Amino acid sequence: MKKNNLKVVKINKTKSLFNYEKKVLIKELILGLKLGYFDFEKEKPQKVKFNLEVNYQDKQPSNDKDIKSIVNYAKIVKLIKKLVKNKHYNFLETLAEDVFDELFKDKRIDKITLQIEKLEIMKDLSLIHI
């Protein structure tokens, strides 16, 4: 009879090496903003819809008493509103880049999925998005 050689493997996992993966979803944030390259787009604010998925990691669990322990959805919405308040964007792509640049300042954020839609842009078209 063959004897099996079994080894006991001990795994130590320290909490300091553990990452908490978290996600913030913002759906259908609709704002009126100055956006567009063509003259007719510059005449008045346009309705634009934002959908975001922000993934982030943290070495600490969320603290229910400290809002700084999370990526705050209200802060993200406020940031987007601030970006579009006084600036005219010619292109959706430029607006998206500014949103990315601002959000990635938070080092916990490692991935952002952003969809921006121009609503009611043309008579025969329901929306344009990137």
Give the label of every model feature segment.
Residues M1-I128:
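N-terminal, polar/charged subdomain of small-to-medium soluble alpha/beta proteins
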